[in-house]
Amino acid sequence: MVYLFVIDDDYIVYVGNYPSSDTKIAILPEKLREFYMHIHNGWFESISGGLGLLPIEKIQFLDESERGLPQEILQSVELSKTYYVFHNGGGFLCINTENAANPKSLVWWTNNRPKLGIDFWSFLDSWIEIGFLY
């Protein structure tokens, strides 16, 4: 599905893929999993492919890609248990599943220490809003 927004006489196009039944969505927290299963398999800006929720097939654990950061930063989070669902060019909105019953959210920056203990939905809303203002 294509969403066309007009903001200050500029057109912004977002894409929402068909809902997913991919077994990989089991890693997502319940509310996010419901979005992927019943509404969209990702919802993102059409040109960059970012500024929104990534399709399940593009979600990656942080240990699956080299970040080029100092070891002290890389060790601040268990990379194999932290995956990102959103990127904005400078940071990644992530979910850490070290405690699967109570996943934590964080921002993984491309050039700085992660911001831990964030409210996932507040950051998601804010970053989508920022995308509309570009």
Residues of each region from the PLM?
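A surface-exposed partner-binding patch
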Residues: 1-93
